[in-house]
Amino acid sequence: MYKFDPKLNHSAAHVLAMALTKFYPNLSLAIGPAIDEGFYYDFNLNDPNTSITPIDLLKIEKEMKKIAAQALTFDYEQVSYEQAKDLFKNNKYKLDIIEENKNKPLSIYHSGKWFDLCKGPHVENTKEIKAIKLLNIAGSYWRGDANNDQLIRIYGVAFNDQAQLDAYLVDLQERKERDHRKIGKDLNLFTFNNLAGQGLPIWLPNGTIIKSQVQKFINEVEFQFNFDTVITPILGSIDLYKTSGHWDHYKDNIFSPVQIDNEVLILRPMTCPHHTLVYSNELRSYRSLPIRLSEHSILHRYESSGGLTGFERVREMILEDCHVFCRPDQIEHEVINAFKMIQEAQEGLGIKTFEIHLSLNDPNDKEKYYDDPQMWEHSQNALRKMLKDHKIPYKEMVGEAAFYGPKIDFQVKTVLNRIITVSTIQLDFLLPNRFNLSYINENNEQSTPVMIHIGIIGTYERLLAILLEQTKGVLPLWLSPVQVVIIPVNENLHADYAKELNAKLRKHLVRSSLDLRNERLSKKIREAQIQKIPYQIVVGDEEIKNDKMVTYRRYGSEETTTVSVDDFIKVLENDIRSKK
């Protein structure tokens, strides 16, 4: 086991800066904080002809260990604004920080002759840093702004004993093996190509099969819960998003508009404005509510290039999106209905909710949130009461609401110990008003419906990333792109039966494949294991002679089983039905 000590890692960041200063005396140090897992330091070498390579990390790490062994203390000194400016007069990054904090206390920490602008805290001396590892080099921008200087960032970790570092490095290797980007590449599920554009995923045939199977399952869940499927345009008039409020509150995440003829259009970042148009397409009565709509839609949202991460953060995504239009007295029933729908979907996908967040607005942030205190109080209290009444444990998260209303977020803890929002239920009193939605109530008067946004699985891209990392790519049979591989012992003697068997399995909608390559049997079996194919069938003389039986082996098992073809198909059907 290991535990990160922020104070220790902050001190290790200073040790890294000391080592860097020795090897690169002309550099400008920027910032070096402790982070959730370790530390980093950002800096500018101030020399376009000099770079730092992974090999350089070894010598820097070696120097860090020498410095740590010297038991240098971390001595605090408070300085004035003028003193700080003088001490760091040749470092524009430190001067920027000093200027930002000129009306606050400023301090530096000394370690021997070296010092840095820092608030602390730190350990007593460097000898407490018993184990150090520099992990990688990355790029960053000063203040995280692409318009500012590009800096070099070195990440590292520090512990107070070697055993913790060793345990962490083992865990880190496991994470690399579970990284959905690596698994996706190994299993030919998806790819990216800069010629297509950054952050624009290309679903390969194997990945498309997984996506199709998930969508088929989710469509069935939506059908069971009485949702009607619609299809709306991938483009929308800018006026649509101005009416909804997205243009005012979400503009930075929307791709630039394009003018076509006399219209200004944008690639849609979400479907909710379109679904209000479906609702308003006909006159609604209180008796016809709730209206439940679903769509699996392609959306486009701008992400900075530095924020793009495999399938987790992309610029084009496929979102499973549901919207309910209901009467106020139906809110509780519809929210609970959404809860049940999400739970059923997560159970089928093997996903378990870690905790539930009630995401609220920040009343002080008038720019991010629609300014209607009464609406926020009403909607947030409605969700809060519902969660309490049904004894559903939750955490309140201020500042995490959508701009138009509060939401219930279903948080999933991945095997990599990351907390990710997969499913969501959002209560919205704003959009129905902005689009003048109405229904005829029991008094034959117009009333405004409530809109509930429901995301059962979120985006398919993020869901696939989670599934790959949870399963290490060993997907259940119903999701596996290739469910069975048929391998003849001899391509000449056994190919005909292998083809006949393949045709029969495919007739039963089993995703089987033939491996008729002129390769060693052991190599074919090994490659089937690498591809994580759930079932392998080896066809030889015995299978053909013995009433055309099949001998199969499950992925990860050395044990083989011989059964009739019909019985094997029953095994597959049972696994698929139970979503094993």
UniProtKB/Swiss-Prot annotation:
Residues 179-476 are annotated as: Catalytic. Binds 1 zinc ion per subunit. PROSITE patterns: AA_TRNA_LIGASE_II (PS50862). One of its GO terms (cellular component) is cytoplasm. One of its GO terms (molecular function) is threonine-tRNA ligase activity. It catalyses: tRNA(Thr) + L-threonine + ATP = L-threonyl-tRNA(Thr) + AMP + diphosphate + H(+). Its EC number is 6.1.1.3. It is an enzyme of class 6 (ligase). It is found in: Cytoplasm. Zn(2+) binds at residues 272, 323, 453. Keywords: Aminoacyl-tRNA synthetase, ATP-binding, Cytoplasm, Ligase, Metal-binding, Nucleotide-binding, Protein biosynthesis, RNA-binding, tRNA-binding, Zinc. SMART domains: tRNA_SAD (SM00863). Gene3D superfamilies: 3.30.54.20, Anticodon-binding domain (3.40.50.800), Bira Bifunctional Protein, Domain 2 (3.30.930.10), Threonyl-trna Synthetase, Chain A, domain 2 (3.30.980.10). GO terms for biological process: threonyl-tRNA aminoacylation. Its cofactor is Zn(2+). Catalyzes the attachment of threonine to tRNA(Thr) in a two-step reaction: L-threonine is first activated by ATP to form Thr-AMP and then transferred to the acceptor end of tRNA(Thr). Also edits incorrectly charged L-seryl-tRNA(Thr). NCBIfam families: thrS. Homodimer. HAMAP family: Thr_tRNA_synth. Belongs to the class-II aminoacyl-tRNA synthetase family. This is Threonine--tRNA ligase. It comes from Ureaplasma urealyticum serovar 10 (strain ATCC 33699 / Western). The lineage of its organism: Bacteria, Bacillati, Mycoplasmatota, Mycoplasmoidales, Mycoplasmoidaceae.
